[in-house]
Amino acid sequence: MAPVSGSRSPEREASGAKRRSPSRSPKSIKSSRSPRCRRSRSRSCSRFGDRNGLSHSLSGFSQSSRNQSYRSRSRSRSRERPSAQRSAPFASASSSAYYGGYSRPYGGDKPWPSLLDKEREESLRQKRLSERERIGELGAPEVWGLSPKNPEPDSDEHTPVEDEEPKKSTTSASSSEDDKKKKRKSSHSKDRAKKKRKKKSSKRKHKKYSEDSDSDSESDTDSSDEDSKRRAKKAKKKDKKKKRRGKKYKKKKSKKNRKESSDSSSKESQEEFLENPWKDRSKAEEPSDLIGPEAPKTLASQDDKPLNYGHALLPGEGAAMAEYVKAGKRIPRRGEIGLTSEEIASFECSGYVMSGSRHRRMEAVRLRKENQIYSADEKRALASFNQEERRKRENKILASFREMVYRKTKGKDDK
């Protein structure tokens, strides 16, 4: 351990000597060497050897012969040389990055890249590549999820006729499953009913035994009365059971009838679908004798409300309408000016109508005005009749009033 410590201390001294060299003169250096450094001659030689070792280690293997000649001078040199060679790269790093025409690519304190780091990077890269290949083959369900096993059929590829066979198979399978479930439920319900009956019968037996023990203690007359009561109770219970069974049988029958009707209707619908698969079945078919558009349902339900369509006849309108009625023609509505009544009737028969609200309003006005029409003679007769009736009423009222006034005045005169 002594030579190693000695090899480190001269390095520090050498660096200190380099720093001091420009300030001191050569005489002072000699004087400092002569008295003091007799003991440390080996140290100075080791300094020289350290410097040579640094330069030789960086310049190459060609200078190894010189190192051998320096080693032969003293044992201290040969002991201190390997330690100097060990510390050579670190000393060169602390000093400049250029020695003997050889420059380090990294410079400064950065170490050389090791082979282990490269091998680690290569192994990590290979692992990453293999992992990505595996993900590409198998997929990552936690990120993307799985695709559907049975995708929905395309409307262009699969027509409804092609899809009928799988539909029938699925319906048959579902119906068989439903039948199995119903059978299981019915069996469970029967077992429960049997258990309940057994419990009831056991309770009845216990009651009977208790009643028998009580009846033994009582008289014979009481026992006969109890027997009759029991018989009556038994008969009532039997009647109730029969009624329940009858109800259950009726329910089962109704369920069977419903199933049969539903099955028959489904079969009929399937047959119709096979005959005409492209028919629209969203609307229910209702036989209608009417030709043209149907009347709106809102008007049919508005019988309770008073209709308030249009207003009174305009001046001259009644006479014009009366002429149409006399001729037996259809009265034209407003908005139909320019067309004859025959043309309008032919258009309506073929299915042409006005826009919805206008058509309803004008049709109602036309019907109301047709009912209002009177000829001029009828109007005169009505007016004269009304006037005569009014005069008669007035005369009656006046006559009764005169009589009353006369009676009162006559009674006063007599007094």
From Swiss-Prot:
UniProt KW Nuclease keyword: no
Biased composition range(s): Basic residues: 33-44, 181-208, 230-258
Key words, A-Z: Acetylation, Isopeptide bond, Notch signaling pathway, Nucleus, Phosphoprotein, Repressor, Transcription, Transcription regulation, Ubl conjugation
Region of interest called Necessary for interaction with CIR1, as start-end residue ranges on this chain: 177-272
Protein name per UniProt: NF-kappa-B-activating protein
Localization terms from the record: Nucleus
Organism expressing this protein natively: Mus musculus
Region of interest called Disordered, as start-end residue ranges on this chain: 1-311
